[in-house]
Amino acid sequence: MADLSAFPITRKWPAKDPSVIQLYSLPTPNGQKASIALEELGLAYEAHRVGLDDANVKSPEFLSLNPNNKIPAIIDPDGPDGQPIGLFESGAILIYLAEKTGRLLGETPADRYHAIQWVMWQMGGLGPMLGQLGFFVKFAGAEIEDPRPRERYINEAKRLLKVLDTSLEGRDWIIGEFSIADIAICPWLNGLAFYEALDLVGWGDLKNVPAYLERFYNRPAAERGRNIPPM
């Protein structure tokens, strides 16, 4: 049986079966990426609920695995060369799991780079912009008197959604076949409803994106993974 004692996080969130991947997460947009990927790939794993409060994400145990105090994070007891590996950052986790299994990165070397390209687009653009949009639209409210930040993130969200909408023309998935790029993108699109921002970003004017998101969550693995571990 694998020995995960070198990972202090297992003292706060003990592994019932240390031979399988350990997921530390919540079903936020970033958290869903990891759980949906694990479900799509059929990998055995345990999900540990990590609250977003300081007692959890800023605990010494969690910081030992992710010093950036964000979910998700994983430990794979069967990492490179058969040695355990801990990882944080949802994009890195997606790429790792895809490379571990040889799946969800397309059929050709070019497909692989296109999938990674769109993961980076989500990590560097769509996720940060929609996250800030959600803060200023749903949470900040009247406390922010200056309208410019809110307008900036609305406009940038519209721009990014147009990029995605155009790129989806004539295809079901962003690189043509289903990949980790779609797993990176769709949970953030889904967050727009939670942020009550669909009308603000012109969701109804998009030709391809709404059907793309519906298609994504119609996948059984995506439907299962969207609420793991339960809130």
Where are these regions (language model features)?
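Phosphate-coordinating loops and pocket residues in cytosolic domains that bind phosphorylated ligands
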Residues: 64, 218, 227
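GST-like fold's C-terminal all-alpha helical module
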Residues: 118-218
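Residue-level recognition of oxygen-bearing side chains
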Residues: 92, 208, 221
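GST-like domain detector, emphasizing the conserved glutathione-binding G-site
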Residues: 1-151, 174
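Short, solvent-exposed turn/loop segments enriched in Gly/Ser/Thr/Pro and often Arg
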Residues: 51, 180, 229
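Residue-level detector of family-conserved "landmark" positions at structurally sensitive sites
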Residues: 48, 226-227
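Active-site-flanking alpha-helical
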Residues: 98, 188-189, 226
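Carbohydrate-binding/catalytic loop surfaces
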Residues: 139, 230-231
